[in-house]
């Protein structure tokens, strides 16, 4: 499919909207009323520091809702106001935050059901309104909805759209797109649908495996088996790894994406020499500013003298998971929670998700004596949720009893 031609056609349709329905001022006011926090605002004004009794809280200097998330959430809410009686669907979670998605359900916005990763659009009818989430949607989904006569409200983050343009550029010039991302993540699924030939690598280890193969140090059958679900149809590593362009899922760890880019540039330089490098490797810049800012702020936060660190965000949120990885890399006790309710009301307990593991409940997670707690949150977490977490910590810090 000529994805660029399809997008041009879609964007000119009177059933497609990517600008929303309300003025930026009204949109900001509605979002502020729903999610902003006076407490968090005052903590920002106080150098991101809050102290109460024996509790000292240090916030990361960049956290929470990014511009792309704010835009997507606001557009989703105003869509219901604009279409008060119509059937409204959304192709996936608007963002990876349970409270925001629950609010949409309460507004009678229905989520497209999926079984084993396959979405069922059979209930969506002509004239229905369908919201595309901040992560975007695959070009095949857009085409299906457009041909069915749906009204499409596109809240895709512009940074994600930028990555789509990058992989389309790769396709136009017959380069294979190496996509640094999680193969089942909604954003990576959407990005790969706009690519031509592509290969998804999860991390530096997988990228090194691919680089070794390029340099003649791999087994073809093993390669094909390893990337059978992470490559374009008919992918041939002997044919398709000769001309490479790099792109990424915008929420991946910035430093790792940059390292992967350098690895493939050096690999192609080694194989083809400096005179032919530009014929075999395309430089890239698809790292999201907001992701970069939050990760940089996290690196600064972990340099603080902290007893523990709380990372707030959806358990399926890629950008939140990478913030947790930074804390772990520094050996700091850290707890990834998705809602304030994971912290006990009176008992000194926290139910959290260790990296790559299931939920566990830890007793006596707040130590005795003075406590220094670092807090950050993913790009899909409202300030009001962070405020509720701080109130939970205040209450527990005032409690005397520890759990046996």
Curated annotation (Swiss-Prot):
Query: Is Oxidoreductase included in the keywords of this UniProt record?
Result: yes
Q: Which GO terms describe its molecular function?
A: 4 iron, 4 sulfur cluster binding; 4-hydroxy-3-methylbut-2-enyl diphosphate reductase activity; metal ion binding
Q: Which reaction does it catalyse?
A: isopentenyl diphosphate + 2 oxidized [2Fe-2S]-[ferredoxin] + H2O = (2E)-4-hydroxy-3-methylbut-2-enyl diphosphate + 2 reduced [2Fe-2S]-[ferredoxin] + 2 H(+); dimethylallyl diphosphate + 2 oxidized [2Fe-2S]-[ferredoxin] + H2O = (2E)-4-hydroxy-3-methylbut-2-enyl diphosphate + 2 reduced [2Fe-2S]-[ferredoxin] + 2 H(+)
Pfam family of this protein, just one? LYTB
Q: Which residues form a coiled coil?
A: none
Q: What class of enzyme is it?
A: oxidoreductase
Q: Which residues bind [4Fe-4S] cluster?
A: 66, 157, 288
Which GO biological-process labels does this protein carry?
dimethylallyl diphosphate biosynthetic process; isopentenyl diphosphate biosynthetic process, methylerythritol 4-phosphate pathway; terpenoid biosynthetic process
Q: What is its EC number?
A: 1.17.7.4
Q: Which residues act catalytically here?
A: 187 (proton donor)
Q: Which terms are listed as keywords in the entry?
A: 4Fe-4S, Iron, Iron-sulfur, Isoprene biosynthesis, Metal-binding, Oxidoreductase
Q: Which CDD domains match?
A: lytB_ispH
Which pathway does this polypeptide act in?
Isoprenoid biosynthesis; dimethylallyl diphosphate biosynthesis; dimethylallyl diphosphate from (2E)-4-hydroxy-3-methylbutenyl diphosphate: step 1/1; Isoprenoid biosynthesis; isopentenyl diphosphate biosynthesis via DXP pathway; isopentenyl diphosphate from 1-deoxy-D-xylulose 5-phosphate: step 6/6
UniProt: dimethylallyl diphosphate binding residues? 96, 185, 317-319, 380
Cofactor comment text = Binds 1 [4Fe-4S] cluster per subunit.
Q: Which residues bind isopentenyl diphosphate?
A: 96, 185, 317-319, 380
Cofactor(s) listed in the protein's UniProt record: [4Fe-4S] cluster
> Record-annotated residues binding (2E)-4-hydroxy-3-methylbut-2-enyl diphosphate?
96, 185, 250, 317-319, 380
The record, for PANTHER family, names:
4-HYDROXY-3-METHYLBUT-2-ENYL DIPHOSPHATE REDUCTASE, CHLOROPLASTIC (PTHR31619:SF5)
Q: What is this protein's function per UniProt? A: Catalyzes the conversion of 1-hydroxy-2-methyl-2-(E)-butenyl 4-diphosphate (HMBPP) into a mixture of isopentenyl diphosphate (IPP) and dimethylallyl diphosphate (DMAPP). Acts in the terminal step of the DOXP/MEP pathway for isoprenoid precursor biosynthesis.
- Family label: Belongs to the IspH family.
What is this protein's name? Answer: 4-hydroxy-3-methylbut-2-enyl diphosphate reductase
Q: Which organism is it from?
A: Prochlorococcus marinus (strain MIT 9211)
**This protein's encoding gene:** ispH
